Amino acid sequence: MSEFAHSTGQFARGWKGNEARRQEFLRRLVQIAVNYVGCWIGAAMFKSDYEKADKVYRVHEFLQPYPFCSITCIALASEWATRHHLDYLPMEFVFEAGDEHWGQLHQRVLEDYKQAPVARAKEQAMALQVADFAAYEIRKVYMSVDEESDDLTSRFRTTLGMLVVNIPHKWGNMTEVGIRTIMNVRGIPKRSSP
């Protein structure tokens, strides 16, 4: 996806500035995802919400932002499988190799789910490329949004809109209150008062 976004590699010739070609390519890629993806799940958080919650609870000692969102995705995927009576099937928790704080994520998944997450390169797992595309689109929405008042749906690009409308999904932004609630439920200690 990064080669496409920057018109490099296999997209170096004839792609840069050719918006009609780029949009048609994206539309076709999204249609493939619509045809083959049963559900997509994602979690995001504003750094400011994470830092506010970390002032109250020992959040960063428990989970850094990437592992926090990853664990949330695993929980949502497990809930989806149960709700659709698919929880008897084995589930792999696959994440892109080389992601930050992998050790923390690995440890937490082992403790919570009694199985290790799997690290794979994007080239080895097509699903990671689709997930990377969706994450890129969602990140663009969140990076341009006013945390307090903006309507996210007005920011959807056509391709992201196609994903949202056509594939069952569960994703959203984790707020300070949500992070603090999770810390409380998990019994993570509060910070000592100065």
Model features per residue range: what roles?
Residues 1-194:
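Phosphate-ester processing/binding pockets and catalytic centers
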